[in-house]
Curated annotation (Swiss-Prot):
HAMAP family: ATP_synth_beta_bact. GO terms for molecular function: ATP binding; ATP hydrolysis activity; proton-transporting ATP synthase activity, rotational mechanism. The keyword Membrane applies. Belongs to the ATPase alpha/beta chains family. Produces ATP from ADP in the presence of a proton gradient across the membrane. The catalytic sites are hosted primarily by the beta subunits. ATP binds at residues 152-159. SMART domains: AAA. Its EC number is 7.1.2.2. It catalyses: ATP + H2O + 4 H(+)(in) = ADP + phosphate + 5 H(+)(out). It is found in: Cell inner membrane. F-type ATPases have 2 components, CF(1) - the catalytic core - and CF(0) - the membrane proton channel. CF(1) has five subunits: alpha(3), beta(3), gamma(1), delta(1), epsilon(1). CF(0) has three main subunits: a(1), b(2) and c(9-12). The alpha and beta chains form an alternating ring which encloses part of the gamma chain. CF(1) is attached to CF(0) by a central stalk formed by the gamma and epsilon chains, while a peripheral stalk is formed by the delta and b chains. This is ATP synthase subunit beta. PROSITE patterns: ATPASE_ALPHA_BETA.
Length: 465
């Protein structure tokens, strides 16, 4: 059905139809020419203004659009390619390839606006999602089909953890991952693509990018594009998929820009009045069903370090676990720089993990907390002033700290150490031994950058030789 553009206000475009009214979220296509180049622009219907006029949000730059241009209603929402063919490729918000690779014909396409799975289809089992990363599996384990927040400043290693998770899911669980770059820097997206290519995980992951320079419509809907691809793997192929959203804050931020452009009255701190429901719609689709699961890791930017800001506060309500990266730990050379005391998980429960895992996790945290409390005394008076018991606690805490480091597969290029995947059983056994004092005689450097505890013992013997 043909309409005519009646008004262009940046990323917001009004279209008049004669005897047809596009539904909310229906896609509308506009073809126009700028300086001899033909452009295709997709608009998404956002509001009905009366008299068959609709207000739409542009999914790309609207420079060169003029009033009077023809706009064709496509009769359905934006649909994007799904299935195994999407692996190893980069898509934009409307599902077009943007990686300069060869053109591909996609026979399967799904609408990006979908209902979350029905209650009776959802799985209520609490299962642990083994990542092979010691610090995560022991202290803040991920739930299968759960949502994890990855908090950290610039350069602390968020991207490396994301790539390691993609690697471990691909090689240990032979699973697929989907990465949605929401309001990302183009450079970071490019780096991620090249690093994945080098580390050999690219053919197990689909990438969807809506970069920082794009209009708010593209930055907002790109999260749904990625999620739709992940849903296909879960619902049609019965797989356990890993879904990365970097950065979930930009999803709320672009929603707030769209809301203002559409003329809605803002709520707290200028955010859209529908912030909680938009976030809920996205997050409710990320879940476990009886067929498969989507486990999501979402990087969360906290504006001005204010955790009470409505955008991060809305995300918190949905998270099952938080992985907090700490610059102070990275400065000690301990990678992954996950803070063992700040990271949390609802899975840390004896009924889910079992008594032994829970006891050891809490024991490790208690030793590290005691060490933290003693640090002021050590700084002022030195180790000699501590009681024998405290000296032993400090010694074990330093070993635990070192043992929480781990060589990553995707970091082999710059560490020179082969990556290690440590199973949950090995992780628990290793930390249990340290807490019980089995390895008190080993030097603490033997625990640095190793996989399981046997490697630490072998390293200690090598150091003695």
């Amino acid at each position: 059905m043909k309409g005519i553009i009646s008004q262009v206000m940046g990323p917001v475009v009004d279209v008049d139809f004669k005897d047809y009214l596009p539904k909310i979220n229906e896609a509308i296509e506009v073809n126009f020419t700028v300086e001899g180049n033909t452009h295709k622009l997709i608009l998404e219907t956002a509001a009905h203004l009366g008299d068959n006029r609709v207000r739409t949000i542009a999914m790309d730059m609207s420079e060169g659009l003029t009033r009077g241009l023809d706009a064709i209603a496509l009769g359905s929402p934006i649909s994007v390619p799904v299935g195994e063919k999407v692996l190893g490729r980069i898509f934009n918000v409307i599902g077009d390839l943007i990686d300069e690779g060869e053109e591909e014909k996609f026979d399967k396409k799904w609408s990006i606006h979908r209902d979350p799975p029905a209650f009776e289809d959802q799985s209520t089992k609490s299962e642990i999602f083994e990542t092979g990363i010691k610090v995560v599996d022991l202290l803040a384990p991920y739930a299968k089909g759960g949502k994890v927040g990855l908090f950290g400043g610039a350069g602390v290693g968020k991207t490396v953890i994301i790539m390691e998770l993609i690697h471990n899911v691909a090689f240990k669980h032979s699973g697929y991952s989907v990465f949605a770059g929401v309001g990302e820097r183009t450079r970071e997206g490019n780096d991620l693509y090249n690093e994945m290519k080098e580390s050999g995980v690219l053919d197990k992951v689909a990438l969807c990018y809506g970069q920082m320079n794009e209009p708010p419509g593209a930055r907002n809907r790109i999260a749904l594009t990625g999620l739709t691809m992940a849903e296909y793997f879960r619902d049609e192929m019965g797989l356990d998929v890993l879904m990365f959203i970097d950065n979930i804050f930009r999803f709320s931020q672009s929603g707030s820009e769209m809301s203002a452009l559409l003329g809605r009255i803002p709520s707290a701190v200028g955010y859209q009045p529908t912030l909680a429901s938009e976030m809920g719609r996205l997050q409710e689709r990320i879940t476990s069903t009886k067929k498969g699961s989507i486990t999501s890791v979402q990087a969360v930017y906290v504006p001005a370090d204010d955790l009470t800001d409505p955008a991060p506060a809305t995300v918190f309500a949905h998270l099952d676990a938080t992985t907090v990266l700490n610059r102070a730990i990275a400065e000690k050379g301990i990678y992954p720089a996950v803070d063992p005391l700040d990271s949390t998980s609802r899975m840390l429960d004896p009924q889910i993990l079992g008594e032994e895992h829970y006891k050891i996790a809490r024991g490790v945290q208690a030793v590290l907390q005691k060490y933290k409390d003693l640090q002021d005394i050590i700084a002022i008076l030195g180790m000699d002033e501590l009681s024998e018991e405290d000296k032993l606690t400090v010694d074990r805490a330093r070993k635990i700290e070192k043992y929480l480091s781990q060589p990553f597969f995707v970091a082999e290029v710059f560490t020179g150490s082969p990556g290690k995947y440590v199973s949950l059983e090995e992780t628990i056994a290793g930390f249990k031994g340290i807490l019980e004092g089995k390895y008190d005689q080993l030097p603490e450097n033997a625990f640095y950058m190793v996989g399981n505890i046997d490697e630490a013992i072998a390293k200690a013997e090598k150091m003695r030789a």
